[in-house]
Amino acid sequence: MGKLNMKDWIGQTILNKKVISIPIMTHPGIELIGKTVHDAVTNGQVHYEAIKALCDKYPAAAATVIMDLTVEAEAFGAEIIFPENEVPSVSGRLLADEAAIDALEIPALNKGRIAQYLKANMLTAKNITDRPVLAGCIGPYSLAGRLYDCLLYTSPSPRD
């Protein structure tokens, strides 16, 4: 199958009376190929193989790649913790005041794991052509929250 025409796909999907599903799941694909979450979030080839395994096994109207809310934060300089079988998380606060915000530089596309996520997306789009491929990325407010460590303010704390 050649390149998918998204306008046609959207039109056909709207006109079709059948309910479609687009599961946003990647962990089962990681397990299917015998890899760890750490493998998938640090290696674009493994990431793609997990998505491909899901597409081969389960029907879905679209393929979704891993949306890792730490990729962009890492590219900006945040420290990331990588548990073997859990999603990565930001450790601590990168931004503490307005001066730190003003000093931020827009990261290059080769910073942190961005290149691996681009690789996973390119491989998925090139090889999974029977359905749309939906890439995930963090929004500006979520990114700001991770750089400023807003979890500090939203997590329960012990009472005195």
Language model segments and positions:
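Short, flexible micro-motifs
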Residues: V37, S142, D160
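Short, structured secondary-structure boundary patches
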Residues: E84-S89, P156
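N-terminal basic, low-complexity leaders that serve as flexible interaction/assembly modules and, when applicable
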Residues: M1-E84
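Conserved small/polar residues in nucleotide/adenosyl-binding loops
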Residues: Y153-D160
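A gly/proline- and charged-residue-enriched helix-loop-helix capping module
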Residues: V87-L123
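Residue-level preference for long, well-ordered alpha-helices that form the structural scaffold
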Residues: A40-H47, I106-R113, S155
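Glycine-rich, aromatic-flanked loop segments that form ligand/cofactor-binding clefts
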Residues: N16-M25, A62-N85, G112-L151
